[in-house]
Amino acid sequence: MTHLKGFDLLALGFMTFALFLGAGNIIFPPSAGMAAGEHVWSAAFGFLLTGVGLPLLTVVALARVGGGIGRLTQPIGRRAGVAFAIAVYLAIGPLFATPRTAVVSFEMGVAPFTGDGGVPLLIYTVAYFSVVLFLVLNPGRLVDRVGKVITPVLLSALLVLGGAAIFAPAGEIGSSSGEYQSAPLVQGFLQGYLTMDTLGALVFGIVIATAIRDRGISDSRLVTRYSMIAGVIAATGLSLVYLALFYLGATSQGIAGDAQNGVQILTAYVQQTFGVSGSLLLAVVITLACLTTAVGLITACGEFFSDLLPVSYKTVVIVFSLFSLLVANQGLTQLISLSVPVLVGLYPLAIVLIALSLFDRLWVSAPRVFVPVMIVALLFGIVDGLGAAKLNGWVPDVFAKLPLADQSLGWLLPVSIALVLAVVCDRLLGKPREAVA
């Protein structure tokens, strides 16, 4: 096959959409929509800029270099690049995100029917990771199995939920609260940033590229083109889901005004609108959303570590699936306390890496720009990580006084200054001298 047919390309886009749509993507927008109230659309637009825009730019950046994070990190050197990639894959994979998909889907989709006991959780997670392992053992079939089978079911459930939210709202749009009253666009922008979907996009790039190549596409330009199209399809789907869920939250103050999170808002809405069957609908949405995300994460880790280490893809995915199963049943709380600071610390590095890569044609010497700017991002990533670990006493007060520091964006101004200085030096120094043989 030299080109993807329209249906195959759509299935690729559906697969990409399903990889990104985790439980958190469904849970958060309703709570943000409820807080935004009459400013719901301004907040939703700000949320889309970062919650959808940043992951889409990441997919584009990865597509331009062939799908692998290793190519993106070349300007900072092999050792630093490999260290960064390992940290991202482990933190977003078996140490945190993958086990969490199983626990969240159990607590939201199954526990209401079975209870929260250890035995139901064990039975569920064994079945859950068995399905995950079945799907990931043959990554070349992901488009067929996820894009053509699982995602249409997920989309159908989302259409029912989203359609009901729009055409059968629980009430009128409520009033805004908190910071959404004065700056809804900015608040939505910041909350979209805090979803950290950019880290997921970094690891999913290789899954998308591999799925395309496994369809017989060998032309690198076509791989890039199809990856970008898949990213656009996924971004469109995510945007529609987010908008519907924002509206659901904004119109649910009458039935869930005291809700503490999106789970309670969604539960209140589906039970009022659909009755007992609403809980089943929500269970299907959450379980399939978590399942497809877990499949993407395990597949990405398998592709990366089998290429990095002298072990087979099959061995990696089996080991990571078993490890995730164990963590989901007994070690999640402790690993979350360790992994969340790592994720927060890696996020500035990931965003800076993507931004510099997208504008790589502007740099005379990429390493002269990448290295100093990434070092500054690393410094402030460590600061944010310490803050997430509740170790603020280790951080000098000056960091807390930076603009947007309370929103985990204290790194933005220093990194911008470092970028300007690096670009000026890059232009002044000119082209690097070529080595003489």
UniProtKB/Swiss-Prot annotation:
Regions crossing the membrane: 9-29, 43-63, 80-100, 117-137, 149-169, 192-212, 228-248, 280-300, 308-328, 335-355, 369-389, 404-424
Alphabetical GO biological process terms: branched-chain amino acid transport; isoleucine transport; L-leucine transport; valine transport
Annotated localization: Cell inner membrane
GO cellular component, one term: plasma membrane
InterPro entries: Brnchd-chn_aa_trnsp_Livcs
Metal-binding as UniProt keyword: no
Principal localisation: membrane
Keyword vocabulary terms for this entry: Amino-acid transport, Cell inner membrane, Cell membrane, Membrane, Transmembrane, Transmembrane helix, Transport
Pfam families xref list: Branch_AA_trans (PF05525)
One example GO MF annotation: L-valine transmembrane transporter activity
Top-level taxonomic group: Bacteria
NCBIfam families to which the protein is assigned, alphabetical: livcs (TIGR00796)
Family named by the database record: Belongs to the branched chain amino acid transporter family.
Function comment: Component of the LIV-II transport system for branched-chain amino acids. BraB is specific for isoleucine, leucine and valine. The LIV-II transport system is coupled to sodium and lithium ions.
Name of this chain's protein: Branched-chain amino acid transport system 2 carrier protein
